């Protein structure tokens, strides 16, 4: 069976003159069978046209054929939930989960990644706010490894296995668990830290092969449009090029099991 990769990106013009730039409004992607292509594309456009961030000035929909033999099927990460009272507590919980993973890798070399990341966490997260993709942060050196610091690194070509949804509503959980599962399986990946940029969604997560997918129910204030994603990577385990190649080009379907 052949599949089709469908990608939608929507943006709007912001500012005037030299300060004019494109601001991301909405994005979505799916991998579906031929019979679902038309309906899913229509749903993606509806989603872009009805976003809380406003009306888009530009919508791009890309359709690409994908051979079944090129697809890797992964079982979704196990899911746990962490309830918190404040977003500050949520960020502390997230770091508390990441720190042991960093410490384990410190023992393998002269890396003070955990300490550096704790000191820089807030600054790193703020740096991701205007980025279109994720930050790729090397825990071995403390350096950012994205080829384009504005664009960042995007994990693409992924969907849930057997997914038949065609409506335009965003399913935050499904989209996040699919992305987190693919990212966790990338060469050299240690963990992922994510806060949604949706002003109406305050849940974030930390994910890795060791932790699974940990939903932290409050990571920012309601109405805050800022959000970002950091991929914590270990350059002693794989090259940045190998990791980015997997994230951006490998086709993946995720068998989503359970929800918390």
Swiss-Prot record:
Requisite cofactors: Mg(2+)
Q: What is its EC number?
A: 6.2.1.14
Q: Which family is this sequence assigned to?
A: Belongs to the BioW family.
InterPro entries with a match to the protein in the record: BioW
Q: What UniProt keywords apply to this chain's record, in alphabetical order? A: ATP-binding, Biotin biosynthesis, Ligase, Magnesium, Nucleotide-binding
Keyword Transcription among record annotations: no
Functional note: Catalyzes the transformation of pimelate into pimeloyl-CoA with concomitant hydrolysis of ATP to AMP.
Please give the superkingdom of this protein's source.
Bacteria
- Pathway in which the depicted protein is active: Metabolic intermediate metabolism; pimeloyl-CoA biosynthesis; pimeloyl-CoA from pimelate: step 1/1
Q: Which GO terms describe its molecular function?
A: 6-carboxyhexanoate-CoA ligase activity; ATP binding; magnesium ion binding
GO-annotated biological processes: biotin biosynthetic process
Q: State the protein's name.
A: 6-carboxyhexanoate--CoA ligase
Quaternary structure and partners: Homodimer.
User: Which reactions does this protein catalyse?
Assistant: heptanedioate + ATP + CoA = 6-carboxyhexanoyl-CoA + AMP + diphosphate
């Amino acid at each position: 069976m052949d599949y089709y990769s469908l990608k939608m990106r929507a943006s709007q013009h912001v500012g005037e003159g030299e300060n004019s730039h494109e601001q991301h409004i909405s994005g979505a992607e799916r991998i579906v069978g031929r019979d679902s292509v038309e309906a899913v594309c229509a749903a993606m456009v509806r989603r872009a046209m009805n976003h809380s961030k406003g009306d888009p000035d530009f919508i791009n929909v890309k359709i690409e054929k994908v051979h079944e033999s090129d697809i890797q099927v992964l079982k979704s990460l196990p899911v746990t939930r962490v309830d918190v009272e404040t977003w500050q507590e949520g960020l502390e919980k997230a770091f508390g989960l990441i720190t042991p993973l960093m410490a384990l890798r410190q023992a393998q070399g002269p890396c003070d990644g955990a300490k550096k990341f704790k000191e820089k966490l807030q600054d790193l997260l703020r740096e991701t706010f205007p980025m279109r993709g994720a930050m790729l942060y090397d825990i071995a050196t403390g350096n950012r490894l994205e080829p384009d610091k504005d664009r960042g690194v995007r994990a693409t070509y992924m969907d849930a296995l057997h997914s038949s949804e065609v409506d335009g509503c965003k399913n935050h959980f499904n989209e996040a668990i699919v992305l987190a599962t693919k990212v966790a399986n990338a060469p050299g990946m240690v963990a992922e830290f994510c806060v949604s940029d949706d002003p109406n969604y305050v849940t974030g997560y930390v994910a890795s092969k060791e932790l699974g997918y940990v939903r932290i129910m409050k990571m920012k204030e309601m109405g805050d449009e800022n959000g970002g994603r950091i991929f914590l990577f270990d350059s002693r385990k794989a090259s940045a090029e190998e990791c980015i190649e997997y994230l951006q080009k490998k086709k993946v379907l995720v068998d989503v099991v359970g929800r918390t």
